[in-house]
Amino acid sequence: IVLLMVVTSNADRICTGITSSNSPHVVKTATQGEVNVTGVIPLTTTPTKSHFANLKGTQTRGKLCPNCLNCTDLDVALGRPKCMGTIPSAKVSILHEAKPVTSGCFPIMHDRTKIRQLPNLLRGYENIRLSTSDVINAETAPGGPYTVGTSGSCPNITNGEGFFETMAWAIPKNKTAMNPLTVEVPYICTKGEDQITVWGFHSDNETQMVILYGDSKPQKFTSSANGVTTHYVSQIGGFPNQTEDEGLKQSGRIVVDYIVQKPGKTGTIVYQRGVLLPQKVWCASGRSKVIKGSLPLIGEADCLHEKYGGLNKSKPYYTGEHAKAIGNCPIWVKTPLKLANGTKYRPPAKLLKERGFFGAIAG
């Protein structure tokens, strides 16, 4: 801790000290223990919990898409049809969803992959945009030709059947089993950004698997990018009818994952029947600091603190709960600090001939 000093004369030097008693004029020094002084200035405050706010002078992001009503951040990240919009740039992002949140669309097996981490991954970037073109032509991909499937459980903006914008449900026109095939995922971002490519696969009960794909056996899938390879085998059947958006209930499930492609790097996906091929990709650049918090963001604050919310800095130090903080924040200390702004106190009955340095404290 940097010690703050006030020079009161050539002979007296008073330094920051910790409070020793209820008296505001007693400080504990490193060399002379408890010392009475003629005046002190408090240097610490104990904050009270408040709402979170926008960080002063900094673009602060709450929801990924503020204008996407009734949408979770995962809805936005996957491109749910009713949750398409612009993600504003931000230097600071609030991790506001306290627990893993599902997507209100086709039932997803969230625990099979890291897909719930996707919104947090996007929050960590300053600039995020969805590509205007598809990364793969799903209809003519290996193993096709395919029809791009839609679902009543994932309605579009006109309440017709839809599907996620980031993926194409590849339903083969020829209902036959297929050995694993490979498709390359090119890099299509145009500004040197990281490319986040979403993909997945669908599985259902044996009857539906035969109807949709001509094969009722478990299917194998693999993704690879930047030296990271992930393998999956689909689960056949055993799912209760379910919907995540009060739409048409589904007996099937989808597993969704993503790969991160660095500029110019190609990814690969090895798949069998039921693949959800990548379509629009996220192009992301810059860094955004992420802090746990809550919405709405009200007003502005000097500092965002995970335990106290938005803080305005009134003192250089604070006591209380120690946690991550972003911005112009006070420094956490265990014990309240005060700055002596007077001289060493001398009782009137006792004359002191020598006036000298009486120590700095341990911070």
Swiss-Prot record:
It comes from Influenza B virus (strain B/GL/1954). Keywords: Disulfide bond, Fusion of virus membrane with host endosomal membrane, Fusion of virus membrane with host membrane, Glycoprotein, Hemagglutinin, Host cell membrane, Host membrane, Host-virus interaction, Lipoprotein, Membrane, Palmitate, Signal, Transmembrane, Viral attachment to host cell, Viral envelope protein, Viral penetration into host cytoplasm, Virion, Virus entry into host cell. It is a single-pass type I membrane protein. Major glycoprotein, comprises over 80% of the envelope proteins present in virus particle. GO terms for molecular function: host cell surface receptor binding. Binds to sialic acid-containing receptors on the cell surface, bringing about the attachment of the virus particle to the cell. Plays a major role in the determination of host range restriction and virulence. Class I viral fusion protein. Responsible for penetration of the virus into the cell cytoplasm by mediating the fusion of the membrane of the endocytosed virus particle with the endosomal membrane. Low pH in endosomes induce an irreversible conformational change in HA2, releasing the fusion hydrophobic peptide. Several trimers are required to form a competent fusion pore. In natural infection, inactive HA is matured into HA1 and HA2 outside the cell by one or more trypsin-like, arginine-specific endoprotease secreted by the bronchial epithelial cells. One identified protease that may be involved in this process is secreted in lungs by club cells. Palmitoylated. It is found in: Virion membrane; Host apical cell membrane. Residues 1-11 form the signal peptide. Homotrimer of disulfide-linked HA1-HA2. Its main location: virion. Glycans are attached at N36, N70, N156, N174, N205, N241, N312, N341. This is Hemagglutinin. GO terms for biological process: fusion of virus membrane with host endosome membrane; fusion of virus membrane with host plasma membrane; symbiont entry into host cell; virion attachment to host cell. The keyword rRNA-binding does not apply. Belongs to the influenza viruses hemagglutinin family. GO terms for cellular component: host cell plasma membrane; membrane; viral envelope; virion membrane. InterPro entries: Capsid_hemagglutn (IPR008980), Hemagglutn_HA1_a/b_dom_sf (IPR013828), Hemagglutn_influenz_A/B (IPR001364).
